[in-house]
Amino acid sequence: MNRRDFIKSAAASAACASAGIAIPANLSAASEAEKGWRWDKAACRFCGTGCGIMVATKEGKIVAVKGDPEAPVNRGLNCIKGYFNAKIMYGEDRITHPLLRVNEKGEFDKKGKFKQVSWKQAFDVMEAQFRKTYDELGPHGVGVLGSGQYTIPEGYTAAKMMKAGFRSNSIDPNARHCMASAVVGFIQVFGIDEPSGCFDDIELTDTIVAWGANMAEMHPILWARVSDRKLSNPDRVKVVNLSTYSTRTSNLADIEIIFAPSADLAIWNYIAREIVYNHPEMIDEEFVKKHCIFTTGPADIGYGLRPDIKYKKYLSSELDTAATEKSKVLSEAEGVTLSYLGLKAGDTMENKNTATAGNHWHISFEEFKKALAPYTLEFTAKVAKGDPNEDIEEFKGKLKALADLYIEKNRKVVSFWTMGFNQHQRGTWVNEQAYMVHFLLGKQALPGSGAFSLTGQPSACGTAREVGTFVHRLPADMVVNNPKHREISEKIWKLPAGTLNGIPGSHYVKMMRDLEDGKVKFIWVQVNNPWQNTANANHWIKAAREMDNFIVVSDPYPGISAKVADLILPTAMIYEKWGAYGNAERRTQHWRQQVLPVGEAMPDIWQMLEFSKRFKLKDVWGEKKLNDKVTLPSVLDAAKAMGYSEEDTLFDVLFANEEAKSYPANDPIMENFDNTEVFGDKRGVIGSDGKEFKGYGFFVHKYLWEEYRKFGLGHGHDLADFDTYHRVRGLRWPVVDGKETQWRFNTKFDPYAKKAAPNDKFAFYGNKAAALPSGDLKGVTDKEKTPLTNKAKIFFRPYMDPCEMPSSEYPFWLCTGRVLEHWHSGTMTMRVPELYRAVPEALCYMHEQDAAKLGVLQNEIVWIESRRGKVKARVDLKGRNKPPVGLVYVPWFDENVFINKVTLDSTCPISKETDYKKCAVKIYKA
């Protein structure tokens, strides 16, 4: 029986059984094949949708995966990647043992070749290199590059190890690359992170607008729900796709708007202008007056490039773009949009607020209205039209139709976005603008209406953001530079007062730059591939390989980061360990370990706990110099007063304390399931001490979860207990009195909103930046701060050009991203034969007119070259992605088409998130 027949037979067999019909012989064969299978629920490994899956195991191996029909997110449906959750674990080149660069004597040698070593030797060398850097450069000389794919307990362990143990805030996730702009948008607008709505909005709305979000490929299960909603009432339900190139999402759209890179800023202001100037009666005045204030901030904020515009390691070709960090000559469009600052086209704007880019202040509605004045339909269409072949009048008609959909009375609207907004030199601004329009119309925090940021990774919300694995964060939206937040954290973690470091570490891109500068010399990479996923990659590869730096990569496969590393630690994959993820709608889901890791691979939690055994309090809690101005005080005497000994290890204090050991190993939830960290396992892995690892003897995952949830209880981030999540298909926080929350800030649904404003409809109860000075469009005029109790902010933000635009030498825009069949850098999905065969290489999607001008044919190889580097790729003129003239699209999943050698490491100056969506390139035949 082949695979297709088996699947058909299995489905028919199940149908017959449920109907009480006798099962035919061929169907019985399928049922027979399933004998001895154990099915258990889990979460999908891939995107931020958070699909539920069912995993079948037999004889210690995963034998099948299917969609979970009881999962409310996907209702039994999986995308193509979801069906291969098992196969990602069984690639032929899976790393099964620690690998260290050594010389002929077997000693560590940075110029040596990788050789299999024991866990003990791996940790011995790792410890020595860590101590060397820690002693030389202090807590911020060492760093961890973490992930939005960490399980929640993994991220919590990493944050606790670094911040409480090593007193270092230099831990940042790859979610910096995908969600930081959304996070800062939430914090600046609402005073608290994460969406107000939920996926139920899809079935309740009349209008779905995708902004820089190719949902058909990047969130295919959500797109299936969107498609179902559209088809349920095609005349009423409208779909709009706004993008810089045509995608599969356009296939369902009633309106497709192809706009010029960064022109989303202008389009949002055009919609707001239409509301304020031409349809003032549609402003929800009661909502705005009660629940919002108008704000703005500086425009001269730079582009997140190095402050040293003549940096010695820049290529000469990089200097022109680098110079924009200091100043920029304004374009014709910017002369119009920045006229409120007294500037005009041709003026040089000095970027004086690069260090204070996030500052903002209260302005009047009249000032807000004045700022919107330039964004007429004529001006916006001229700036925003992204397809040179499109008729300007047709484009204007689309913009007008888009505005009309938002403005229409009683029409519910959901705005979805992902990387097109977030990976943006003004990513924070454009996130804020989405809320601007929804607030003006009173279409936010309502069933079926709201601006909704979609996450790309499976736990960018649940781990990176909620746990606080960013350089500046602590759990539950707390931050390291707030003394009260440090005090709360120290109490929960049972640390001496003053242990936590109040100075944020280096964010993801800054950590790479610090590595190049010798300010960071030790980096531990977990659950991501930074040397493939970071823009302007040539710089960082040289820093890793050519300097006195030590790179540890925990990875199941030999991706680019593993190849540039000095030490590779073999890591257990998703169903080889216990875990939890938190998705884009605040839904938290847990799963059990289904099978043992392969070879000697071990879970990330085990790796961190074993590493923590090697450091005593006297090594890390004494006086530590951070920089020339700041020295962390010794807390050893205070630790002794708490009953600790300076000979105690970080493992003893942080992870194997009395509370941890109170969670017994005989918990019923573990019955008949493996738990490598708790019990060890039958592989008999020789651990970091040279002895067989036989487990910690207590339920470490449950301890980590129950301690972590203490941070959010009573603070609007309430999570359920560990056992509850193993009984349900996820819950959306805050979970209060056993009930999840669908719509935040709405007193009908959110108990925290009801508590904050019992007699009102809404309460925006976030408390970050909840008091502001006042001013006008040019700046602060009254420094006295006014409290903003239960209010959100409506920001004005201007249109500005990107810092690098096409020129005669580099005439094309380059945009990067993903494709349906592959995940991120492809280290997992490129090892699944079916996915590899479907899309074996990254292509350069190009318009036929551009190809004709270059003399390039379908499937020919071209060079794609920027000021920073070049790569070769095969041209596709007829594929799924259809760029306009002047733009090319190249996905980044293929290490053989290493497109991040070409991209620009410019970031949003507020969020520090990289803009992968726009830089200038030239293309020519290879």
Curated annotation (Swiss-Prot):
Residues 1-30 form the signal peptide. Keywords: 4Fe-4S, Electron transport, Iron, Iron-sulfur, Metal-binding, Molybdenum, Nitrate assimilation, Oxidoreductase, Periplasm, Signal, Transport. InterPro entries: Asp_de-COase-like_dom_sf, CT_Nitrate-R-NapA-like, MoPterin_dinucl-bd_dom, Mopterin_OxRdtase, Mopterin_OxRdtase_4Fe-4S_dom, MopterinOxRdtase_cofactor_BS, Periplasm_NO3_reductase_lsu, Prok_molybdopt-oxidoreductase. One of its GO terms (molecular function) is electron transfer activity. It is found in: Periplasm. CDD domains: MopB_CT_Nitrate-R-NapA-like. Binds 1 [4Fe-4S] cluster. It comes from the Bacteria. [4Fe-4S] cluster binds at C44, C47, C51, C79. Mo-bis(molybdopterin guanine dinucleotide) binds at residues 81, 149, 174, 178, 211-218, 419, 423, 529, 554-555, 577, 604, 816-825, 900, 917. It catalyses: 2 Fe(II)-[cytochrome] + nitrate + 2 H(+) = 2 Fe(III)-[cytochrome] + nitrite + H2O. Residues 37-93 form the 4Fe-4S Mo/W bis-MGD-type domain. Its cofactor is [4Fe-4S] cluster; Mo-bis(molybdopterin guanine dinucleotide). GO terms for biological process: Mo-molybdopterin cofactor biosynthetic process; nitrate assimilation. SUPFAM superfamilies: ADC-like (SSF50692), Formate dehydrogenase/DMSO reductase, domains 1-3 (SSF53706). GO terms for cellular component: membrane; nitrate reductase complex; periplasmic space. Its EC number is 1.9.6.1. The keyword rRNA processing does not apply. Disulfide bonds: none annotated. Substrate binds at W892. Predicted to be exported by the Tat system. The position of the signal peptide cleavage has not been experimentally proven. NCBIfam families: NAPA, PRK13532.1. Belongs to the prokaryotic molybdopterin-containing oxidoreductase family. NasA/NapA/NarB subfamily. Component of the periplasmic nitrate reductase NapAB complex composed of NapA and NapB. Catalytic subunit of the periplasmic nitrate reductase complex NapAB. Receives electrons from NapB and catalyzes the reduction of nitrate to nitrite. This is Periplasmic nitrate reductase. It comes from Campylobacter curvus (strain 525.92). The gene is napA.
